[in-house]
A protein has these predicted regions:
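Conserved catalytic-core segments of large NTP-driven translation/proteostasis enzymes
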Residues: 1-128, 165
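C-terminal effector modules of nucleic-acid-centric enzymes and ribosome-associated factors
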Residues: 95-186
Protein backbone atom coordinates (compact mmCIF):
# COMPACT_ATOMS: atom_id res chain seq x y z
CA UNK A 1 0.00 0.00 0.00
CA UNK A 2 2.95 2.33 0.60
CA UNK A 3 4.65 1.80 -2.77
CA UNK A 4 1.79 3.24 -4.89
CA UNK A 5 1.64 6.30 -2.61
CA UNK A 6 5.41 6.73 -2.88
CA UNK A 7 5.28 6.46 -6.67
CA UNK A 8 2.44 8.98 -6.81
CA UNK A 9 4.40 11.43 -4.63
CA UNK A 10 7.50 11.01 -6.79
CA UNK A 11 5.46 11.63 -9.94
CA UNK A 12 4.01 14.82 -8.41
CA UNK A 13 7.50 16.03 -7.47
CA UNK A 14 8.80 15.37 -10.97
CA UNK A 15 5.89 17.20 -12.58
CA UNK A 16 6.42 20.23 -10.34
CA UNK A 17 10.20 20.42 -10.75
CA UNK A 18 11.29 23.37 -12.86
CA UNK A 19 13.49 22.60 -15.84
CA UNK A 20 16.95 24.14 -15.94
CA UNK A 21 17.10 27.28 -18.10
CA UNK A 22 18.71 27.18 -21.53
CA UNK A 23 20.79 30.36 -21.64
CA UNK A 24 22.36 29.47 -24.98
CA UNK A 25 25.85 29.19 -23.45
CA UNK A 26 26.35 25.48 -22.74
CA UNK A 27 29.17 24.27 -20.52
CA UNK A 28 29.96 20.87 -19.14
CA UNK A 29 32.32 20.75 -16.14
CA UNK A 30 34.19 17.45 -16.59
CA UNK A 31 33.97 15.05 -13.66
CA UNK A 32 35.30 12.02 -15.59
CA UNK A 33 37.42 11.60 -18.70
CA UNK A 34 38.27 8.26 -20.31
CA UNK A 35 38.94 6.61 -23.65
CA UNK A 36 36.89 3.81 -25.24
CA UNK A 37 38.29 1.57 -27.96
CA UNK A 38 36.70 2.52 -31.26
CA UNK A 39 35.23 5.74 -29.86
CA UNK A 40 38.10 7.79 -28.47
CA UNK A 41 37.78 10.45 -25.80
CA UNK A 42 34.65 10.51 -23.63
CA UNK A 43 33.92 13.10 -20.94
CA UNK A 44 31.04 13.14 -18.45
CA UNK A 45 29.45 15.83 -16.33
CA UNK A 46 26.27 17.78 -15.70
CA UNK A 47 25.33 20.05 -18.60
CA UNK A 48 24.72 23.67 -17.56
CA UNK A 49 23.32 26.83 -19.19
CA UNK A 50 22.57 25.43 -22.65
CA UNK A 51 22.27 22.48 -25.02
CA UNK A 52 24.85 20.48 -26.96
CA UNK A 53 24.13 18.60 -30.19
CA UNK A 54 26.03 15.99 -32.16
CA UNK A 55 28.35 17.83 -34.55
CA UNK A 56 28.78 20.94 -32.37
CA UNK A 57 32.23 22.54 -32.35
CA UNK A 58 33.54 22.79 -28.78
CA UNK A 59 36.57 23.97 -26.84
CA UNK A 60 38.08 22.61 -23.61
CA UNK A 61 38.87 25.25 -21.02
CA UNK A 62 41.20 26.37 -19.60
CA UNK A 63 43.32 24.33 -22.05
CA UNK A 64 41.92 26.04 -25.17
CA UNK A 65 41.76 22.83 -27.23
CA UNK A 66 39.27 22.68 -30.10
CA UNK A 67 37.17 19.62 -30.87
CA UNK A 68 33.80 18.40 -32.07
CA UNK A 69 31.03 16.30 -30.51
CA UNK A 70 30.89 12.93 -32.30
CA UNK A 71 28.19 11.50 -30.07
CA UNK A 72 26.36 12.11 -26.82
CA UNK A 73 24.43 10.14 -24.26
CA UNK A 74 22.24 10.90 -21.31
CA UNK A 75 21.48 8.05 -18.88
CA UNK A 76 22.83 5.46 -21.39
CA UNK A 77 20.49 6.75 -24.14
CA UNK A 78 22.09 7.93 -27.39
CA UNK A 79 20.73 11.35 -28.33
CA UNK A 80 21.21 14.00 -30.98
CA UNK A 81 20.81 16.79 -28.39
CA UNK A 82 21.35 17.07 -24.61
CA UNK A 83 19.64 19.69 -22.45
CA UNK A 84 20.64 21.71 -19.35
CA UNK A 85 20.58 19.84 -16.05
CA UNK A 86 21.15 16.41 -17.59
CA UNK A 87 24.01 14.07 -16.78
CA UNK A 88 25.74 13.90 -20.13
CA UNK A 89 28.53 11.93 -21.79
CA UNK A 90 30.23 13.58 -24.77
CA UNK A 91 32.28 11.58 -27.28
CA UNK A 92 34.85 14.10 -28.54
CA UNK A 93 36.89 14.23 -31.74
CA UNK A 94 40.11 16.28 -31.82
CA UNK A 95 40.84 16.28 -28.08
CA UNK A 96 42.80 13.45 -26.46
CA UNK A 97 42.08 11.97 -23.03
CA UNK A 98 45.61 12.87 -21.87
CA UNK A 99 44.91 16.57 -22.58
CA UNK A 100 41.93 16.83 -20.19
CA UNK A 101 41.50 16.64 -16.43
CA UNK A 102 38.66 16.64 -13.95
CA UNK A 103 37.62 20.27 -13.56
CA UNK A 104 38.17 21.24 -17.19
CA UNK A 105 35.07 22.58 -18.94
CA UNK A 106 33.70 21.80 -22.41
CA UNK A 107 31.98 24.83 -23.96
CA UNK A 108 31.20 26.45 -27.29
CA UNK A 109 34.14 28.48 -28.64
CA UNK A 110 34.03 32.13 -27.56
CA UNK A 111 31.41 31.77 -24.83
CA UNK A 112 33.57 31.55 -21.69
CA UNK A 113 37.02 32.76 -20.65
CA UNK A 114 39.07 31.09 -17.93
CA UNK A 115 39.94 33.33 -15.00
CA UNK A 116 42.22 33.16 -11.96
CA UNK A 117 40.45 36.00 -10.12
CA UNK A 118 36.96 35.50 -8.67
CA UNK A 119 34.83 38.27 -7.15
CA UNK A 120 32.40 36.66 -4.69
CA UNK A 121 29.78 37.44 -2.09
CA UNK A 122 30.92 35.21 0.76
CA UNK A 123 28.86 33.93 3.68
CA UNK A 124 31.11 32.59 6.42
CA UNK A 125 29.56 29.74 8.38
CA UNK A 126 28.60 30.68 11.95
CA UNK A 127 30.32 27.60 13.37
CA UNK A 128 33.60 28.08 11.47
CA UNK A 129 36.51 27.30 13.81
CA UNK A 130 38.57 30.44 13.07
CA UNK A 131 38.48 33.97 11.70
CA UNK A 132 39.26 34.44 8.02
CA UNK A 133 42.16 36.83 7.52
CA UNK A 134 43.24 38.80 4.46
CA UNK A 135 45.50 36.73 2.18
CA UNK A 136 44.60 33.40 3.85
CA UNK A 137 45.39 30.43 1.62
CA UNK A 138 42.25 28.42 0.77
CA UNK A 139 40.97 25.68 -1.51
CA UNK A 140 37.93 26.33 -3.65
CA UNK A 141 35.56 23.89 -5.28
CA UNK A 142 33.60 25.18 -8.27
CA UNK A 143 31.87 23.03 -10.87
CA UNK A 144 34.05 19.93 -10.78
CA UNK A 145 37.29 21.89 -10.27
CA UNK A 146 39.40 22.12 -7.14
CA UNK A 147 41.91 24.96 -6.95
CA UNK A 148 44.21 26.60 -4.41
CA UNK A 149 44.20 30.34 -3.93
CA UNK A 150 44.34 33.28 -1.56
CA UNK A 151 41.46 35.31 -0.13
CA UNK A 152 41.58 39.08 -0.50
CA UNK A 153 39.15 40.71 1.91
CA UNK A 154 37.74 43.97 0.59
CA UNK A 155 37.45 46.79 3.12
CA UNK A 156 38.52 44.79 6.19
CA UNK A 157 41.36 42.61 7.44
CA UNK A 158 39.37 39.94 9.31
CA UNK A 159 36.05 38.18 8.69
CA UNK A 160 34.49 36.52 11.73
CA UNK A 161 32.33 33.37 11.64
CA UNK A 162 28.73 34.24 10.72
CA UNK A 163 29.69 37.42 8.83
CA UNK A 164 29.23 38.14 5.12
CA UNK A 165 31.48 40.15 2.85
CA UNK A 166 32.56 40.75 -0.71
CA UNK A 167 35.98 39.36 -1.40
CA UNK A 168 38.30 38.31 -4.18
CA UNK A 169 39.90 34.93 -4.50
CA UNK A 170 43.19 34.87 -6.43
CA UNK A 171 43.63 31.32 -7.76
CA UNK A 172 46.89 29.51 -8.50
CA UNK A 173 45.41 28.31 -11.82
CA UNK A 174 42.36 29.40 -13.84
CA UNK A 175 38.80 28.06 -13.77
CA UNK A 176 35.67 28.66 -15.81
CA UNK A 177 33.04 30.51 -13.79
CA UNK A 178 29.87 32.41 -14.61
CA UNK A 179 28.04 35.11 -12.68
CA UNK A 180 25.89 33.47 -10.00
CA UNK A 181 27.89 30.24 -9.77
CA UNK A 182 28.17 28.85 -6.28
CA UNK A 183 31.44 27.65 -4.83
CA UNK A 184 32.82 26.16 -1.65
CA UNK A 185 35.80 27.68 0.17
CA UNK A 186 37.82 25.56 2.58
Amino acid sequence: ARIPALLENLQTLLENTATKPDLGRPRLPIDRVFSLTGFGTVVTGTLLDGSFSVGDEVVSLPEGLNGRIRGLQTHNQKLQKAFPGSRTALNLVGIEKSQLIRGSVIARPGTYSPTALLDVHFRYLPDAPFELRHNTQVKIFIGSAERAGNVRLLGKDILKPGEQAFLQIKLDSPVVAARGDRLIVR
